[in-house]
UniProtKB/Swiss-Prot annotation:
Disruption phenotype: Cells lacking this gene fail to produce IV-HSL. The keyword S-adenosyl-L-methionine applies. One of its GO terms (molecular function) is acyltransferase activity, transferring groups other than amino-acyl groups. This is Isovaleryl-homoserine lactone synthase. InterPro entries: Acyl_CoA_acyltransferase (IPR016181), Autoind_synthase (IPR001690), GNAT_dom (IPR000182). Keywords: Autoinducer synthesis, Quorum sensing, S-adenosyl-L-methionine, Transferase. It catalyses: 3-methylbutanoyl-CoA + S-adenosyl-L-methionine = N-isovaleryl-L-homoserine lactone + S-methyl-5'-thioadenosine + CoA + H(+). It comes from Bradyrhizobium diazoefficiens (strain JCM 10833 / BCRC 13528 / IAM 13628 / NBRC 14792 / USDA 110).
Length: 219
């Protein structure tokens, strides 16, 4: 199952989150050579890992085998702060119904395709359940055929550019019941996301983030 982890239930997953930060460092720094992310403690953590982040992590027992994260675009996001030039045509989203999707990873021994489909289903399922309409992402262009094959509806926000020697783009992905139904059929599971502990209201949290950001600007 893919576990949804947020501020309201992270006390149940502290060991899992720590393991996942170290896996991110192994994959994005040691394997993919994103040297700007290197940290001496071997944990890949950035400004978008905070109390408003939602992690969707694939667990086998307590072992993390894959995952990704969501972040409210009503706060300064990776796209708006680091890569706004990639969204120069349509602009960076800032909406409680649009969350930024990033740090997608799968451990080496599970890169057979099956877990990828489960992780793609998870973002659709979690967002549909929460009333989120779209996710935004900074992604390498080679993701486009993968998303198309999974039935994702992708809208570019600007022109691609080279980032870390890879052609990279900004886009939104629609959250659609039809897409999720097809993915559920393909993975052979009627549901893939598990939310233990208190239930998160992601849209309400994003609205609060937006209010706080507006107050800081007007102060």
């Amino acid at each position: 199952m893919i576990h949804a982890i947020s501020a309201v239930n992270r006390h149940l997953y502290e060991d899992v989150l720590e393991q996942h930060f170290r896996l991110r460092h192994d994959i994005f720094v040691e394997e993919r050579h994103w040297e700007t992310l290197r940290r001496p403690d071997g944990r890949e953590v950035d400004s978008y890992d905070d109390e408003d982040t939602v992690y969707l992590l694939a667990l086998e027992g307590r072992r993390v085998v894959g995952g990704h994260r969501l972040y409210p675009t009503t706060k300064p996001s990776m796209m708006s702060e680091v890569f706004p030039h990639l969204a120069a045509v349509r602009g960076c989203p800032s909406d409680p119904l649009i969350w930024e999707w990033s740090r997608y990873f799968v451990v080496r021994d599970r890169r057979d395709g099956a877990l990828n489909l489960q992780l793609m289903a998870a973002v659709q399922e979690f967002c549909l359940d929460q009333g989120i309409a779209q996710v935004s992402a900074i992604m390498e262009t080679w993701w486009l055929p993968r998303f198309h094959e999974a039935g994702f509806v992708v809208t570019p926000l600007g022109l691609p550019a080279l980032v870390e020697n890879a052609w990279t783009m900004a886009a939104t992905v629609d959250i659609r019941r039809q897409t999720l139904d097809v993915l559920h059929d393909r993975i052979g599971m009627p549901s893939i996301v598990q939310q233990d502990g208190p239930r998160l209201d992601a849209v309400a949290r994003a609205n609060l983030c937006g209010l706080a950001a507006a107050q800081r600007k007007s102060a």
